[in-house]
Every structure is written in C-alpha cells, then in structure tokens.
C-alpha cells in the first residue's frame, strides 16, 4: 500500500509529508502543486487513495517522500507499478534530487534503470559490479 493512508485523500496524504516543514502554508502548497503537476496527478487531489490505481498510489508515495526533503532516500522498485514512460519520468525526478546533494539508494531488477546509477551493487554476490 506504499505507506499511504487509504481513507484519506491524495491531498491529505501529501500534507503529511509537509507537516513538519518550517515554511509558510503558501510555500507548502506551491511545492505540493509542482510535484503533483510533474507527476501527472493534478486531477486526483480530492480522490481517496483507495480509489487510485497502483501506479497512481506509487506516485503519491514518491511525492510524499520528496516533500519531506530527505537527505537519504531509499526507493525499492520505485517504478514497479508504472508504465515505462511514467517510470522514466519518476527516475529522472529522483536523479534530479541526487543532483541536489541527496543520496539515493535504489533497489531494482530493471537493468536499464540500474545502468543510469553511479554504482551498481549485486546483493546476491555482496559486491560492487559497476561504478560509473
């Protein structure tokens, strides 16, 4: 369920990600709207999470994580329920955060995504297999 609260709306779930940020309400709304538009969820703000598709729920969860502005992000199969085009957009958004001095630890079986990473570690072999 991506850690979302099913009986809340998308908007209410995203507000959780902003709850402890020390910025104005206006700034919070601006940040939230930017991600909502970027991730193609503009028409879903008032929908209850349980009515969303798996891919939509996954995008809401990723937005909520990004709204918390973490230094280290752990993304386990972040594109698993997404179509290829949306998945690539999400990956580019996550990599954009890395460019802002964030750390992204990404677990994936998709080698096309893995090959875009700075380092690849094989968890079965317990070793680094590539460094870009």
Predicted features and spans:
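Short coil-to-helix segment of the ABC ATPase nucleotide-binding domain corresponding to the Q-loop/switch region
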Residues: 8-16
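Conserved ABC ATPase "signature" region
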Residues: 15, 26-44
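Conserved ABC ATPase signature
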Residues: 48-52, 56
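Hydrophobic anchor residue at the start of the ABC signature
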Residues: 62
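Conserved catalytic motifs of ABC-family nucleotide-binding domains
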Residues: 69
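Catalytic Walker B motif of ABC-type/P-loop ATPase nucleotide-binding domains
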Residues: 73-76
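Helix N-cap at the start of a conserved alpha-helix in ABC-type nucleotide-binding domains
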Residues: 84-86
């Amino acid at each position: 369920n991506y850690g979302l609260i099913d009986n809340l709306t998308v908007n209410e779930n995203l507000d959780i990600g902003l709850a402890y940020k020390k910025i104005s309400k206006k700034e919070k709304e601006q940040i939230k709207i930017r991600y909502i538009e970027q991730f193609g969820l503009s028409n879903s703000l008032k929908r209850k999470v349980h009515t969303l598709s798996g891919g939509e729920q996954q995008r809401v969860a990723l937005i909520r994580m990004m709204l918390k502005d973490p230094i280290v992000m752990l993304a386990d199969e972040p594109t698993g329920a997404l179509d290829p085009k949306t998945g690539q957009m999400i990956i580019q958004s996550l990599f954009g955060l890395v460019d802002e001095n964030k750390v992204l630890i990404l677990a994936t079986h998709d080698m096309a995504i893995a090959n875009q990473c700075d380092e690849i570690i094989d968890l079965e072999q317990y070793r680094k297999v590539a460094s870009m």
